[in-house]
Amino acid sequence: MALFLRRLRDLREDNDLSQADVASILGISQTVYSRYERGYQTIPLEHLLTLSKQYKVSLDYITEDVTKNENGRRH
């Protein structure tokens, strides 16, 4: 999960966007987006799809850490 959260933050920062900018793109508050990045709230698939398009990366790239179990194999 840590890689997933770090990747969300890194993608945002690599695109020179603030949390408020991304929240606006997603139609949510900055507080909610901050909770996504810190792992306090589950990010909906719809928002992940929007972010993958915004950042021009695959959904798999964003969620890679989440889709592996502790043995490193995909679910």
Q: Where are each of the predicted segments found?
A:
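DNA major-groove recognition helix of helix-turn-helix/homeodomain DNA-binding modules
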Residues: E46-Y61
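Short basic helix-loop element that most often maps to the first helix and adjoining turn
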Residues: R6-D21, I25, T50
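Recognition helix of helix-turn-helix/homeodomain-like DNA-binding domains
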Residues: L26-T42
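Short, charged recognition helix plus adjacent turn
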Residues: K53, T63-H75
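Conserved hydrophobic/aromatic packing and binding residues within compact polymer-binding modules
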Residues: L8, V22-A23, Y33-Y36, I62
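Short, basic-rich loop-to-helix N-cap that marks the start of a DNA-contacting helix
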Residues: Y40-T50, N71
